[in-house]
Amino acid sequence: IASLMGLSLAKYDSVAVPEQSKGQVTADIKGFNEMGLKGPELLRLMSTGVVEFGTATLSYFASDNPINEAIDLAGLAPDVQTARAVTNAFEPVYARLYGEGNNVKLLGISTYPAQVLFCNAEIKGLADIKGKKVRTSSRTTAEFVEALGGSSVTMAFGEVVPALQNKVVDCAITGSLSGYSAKWYEVSTHLVALPINWNQQIHAVNQKAWDKLDPNVRTFLQANVKTLVDNIWDAAARQTQEGYDCNTGAAACPFPVKGKMVLVQPSDADRALLKKVTQEAVLPKWAARCSAQCVKDFNATVGKTLGVTASK
């Protein structure tokens, strides 16, 4: 497992699952760092059975197949309800893809809190990205920033604080609560409360390992993963708001340390610009690198849900 949400999974699997199964089902949870993994190799390891159960961010697999970007294209889901609807719509496509090509059974898809823009100088809206250097963490967010006239910069999460502090970058995109936890509020001044993307993650299992389990255990695990995924989506919505509150010092922040950032509320013009850039730049670039079947599946699911069309 990996990530902030991975911690939720670890607690759930190591405590809740044994309790609810009365000790009949237990799990040995290991983080990527403990296993010497970076993330992108997880799908291959699950496919071969080296790792039986795993969870990882879909964007890790984007370089292997652009279809893994489909539900998290920058600007596609400006709120958590849309993100969940998009995810649910496309989940059967992923289930088929992983099952047929990788011997992996998809159990569910959860998410991080909203990925939003932190800047170290005044920003009034998305249009102000023009001319700015912005740290991005995926190909689709890089294309989004560049379409707005900004320069995309790739750097590790741990390098962002000094980069913002020393003006190496003007802005950076991360989860609203992740940025708070890393004290980005100490080196940035403005936070734009408009989700750019979400970083959904898959929960999956090697198919052969799954088939060997007792049918009652499979039913139990499937039901519990569904509960876990629902809980993580609820937590992501809550933590997105907590990130806004705590970075800006709002009274609603549940943590003792509060930042003093300015919360920039998106205007109608911001939302329109987000939609325009996604449809005119992000979506066409993604469609160009994904297969014809991939684009067809997108249009039949996500496209139908949102009223958008991707074209090769």
Language model features: what each stretch is:
Residues 78-98:
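A gly/proline- and charged-residue-enriched helix-loop-helix capping module
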Residues 1-81, 99-312:
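N-terminal secretory/targeting leader peptides
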